[in-house]
Amino acid sequence: MHTIDVIDSHTAGEPTRVVLAGFPDLGDGDLAQCRERFRSDFDHWRSAIACEPRGSDTMVGALLLPPRDPSACTGVIFFNNVGYLGMCGHGTIGVVRTLAELGRIAPGQHRIETPVGTVGVALADDGTVSIDNVESYRHAAGVEVDVPGHGRVRGDVAWGGNWFFITEQAPCALGLAQQRELTAYTEAIRLALEAAGITGEAGGEIDHIEISGVAPDGSGAARNFVLCPGLAYDRSPCGTGTSAKLACLAADGKLAEGERWLQQGILGSAFEGSYRHSGRGIAPRISGHAFITARSQLLIDPADPFAWGIVA
């Protein structure tokens, strides 16, 4: 019987499962190399943690590892029900909240190492977590793709720690009641991008689709709908998606450096974003809250036919 110690949380409605102990040794090397060993040798552990019956299509796992960067308080590899993430904004907020729950960090400035770079984080006394995300940028503007049943859809391809196609063309209101229609629409966009050979830089797969609009509550905030790689919609405003959106706004001159941007997700929960100029794009800062929902041990019984998860 294998046991895996985890702490679960949610960030603006989106779950994170932090893996504390019980995972196989991924060896030496940087975190990108560890992620590749995770993928090649231990992918069944990913599905055991993130997939049903223990997880779900919304679950993001966060495996804590000793950092290679001496300035970081921890290393982390993010994963979900279908694969691996370079960075995860809501997941990082969940990791910081979990580290605080464990007494491993106090309010103040910290750094967390990911496979795509080390990010700065700040934990405030009231529990607000702010992330200085990886450098984000717009790769291509005004990209058009023919989407069966919807015609030509225009959007930007941007990096915020993952690759996004961001469009303002929505088939309906951006509300929870419309999530099925929005999911079908964004999945159709993703398939059309793949069929057309449209990618991020160096052939990077565009595995997140984001619809951007105005919040319906009259607050002046923005609202988005984000389709994640496993074809589940993001319950949160999506930290990497908000970073990618900020990069596009900055490139278009629609948001000034340091100006506050309030980004709602499909549930109406919000992240606050801002940026400073950096290199080829921007250095985004995303702020939000996470809440602990469970401390538990996952049990993997070799006799269980679904010990390593239900995988399509």
UniProtKB/Swiss-Prot annotation:
InterPro entries: Pro_racemase_fam (IPR008794). It catalyses: trans-4-hydroxy-L-proline = cis-4-hydroxy-D-proline. Signal peptide: none annotated. Disulfide bonds: none annotated. It comes from Xanthomonas campestris pv. campestris (strain ATCC 33913 / DSM 3586 / NCPPB 528 / LMG 568 / P 25). Belongs to the proline racemase family. Keywords: Isomerase. The active site is at C88, C238. Catalyzes the epimerization of trans-4-hydroxy-L-proline (t4LHyp) to cis-4-hydroxy-D-proline (c4DHyp). Is likely involved in a degradation pathway that converts t4LHyp to alpha-ketoglutarate. Can also catalyze the epimerization of trans-3-hydroxy-L-proline (t3LHyp) to cis-3-hydroxy-D-proline (c3DHyp), albeit with 500-fold lower efficiency. Displays no proline racemase activity. Its EC number is 5.1.1.8. It comes from the Bacteria. This is 4-hydroxyproline 2-epimerase. GO terms for molecular function: 4-hydroxyproline epimerase activity. Substrate binds at G89, H90, H208, D234, G239, T240.
